[in-house]
Amino acid sequence: NAITRRRMEVLRRLATGEPCTIIATVDAMYDKIPALSYMKKYVINIHVAQSLDLDELKGKLVDLGYEKTDSVEEPGQFAIRGGIVDIFPLTEECPYRIDMWDDEVDTIKTFDAESQRSIENVDELVIYPAGEMVLSKERIDRGIHRLEAELKPYAKKLKDSFQTEAYARIKGEIATLKEQLTEFSAIYGVDSYVDYFYSDTVSLVDCLPEDAYIFIDETKKVT
């Protein structure tokens, strides 16, 4: 998703203090997201000569929202074949290939996704989450519990007042969300529930540095 990729690149720059220009609607600037500290917490750093457990790496990448595939073609995908790991970080322009020697990282190089030809060797690879929300099983369970607890009185009220269609719709939406989250499948719109899964949320405005310049176009529409 191109929009997700651009948003994650902006968040990466804000988290690392890199300069960036953001063009967005007022609503988008005030949308809730997890605090940037969560993003920093889940970053994966891999460097040459580092010991690396591939099973552990696979689990971490899945938790970060990356999709395991047979071959890497798009951002947000990774593949493991023997002692070779290909990954296309969401915030990078090209994929990376990690060659292992036993349990140690031998080389890290960028490569072209179409031709599979190597571009250049690098010493380190930094992998950021593939989405704004990193949802472990524990966080999913807590979030679903909070959501169900909040909606339970409302759902009961609908049921008691014989608003059966509205009641069935709410129950269905919760069941679908729960099923998708449990299966760790791609979920669109889950960011609408961010407050249920994270106790510490912010907006993009909160993440801007103190010396940031803010320009508002068409101020009449803002008010």
Which positions does each model-derived feature cover?
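ASCE RecA-like P-loop NTPase motor cores
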Residues: N1-T223
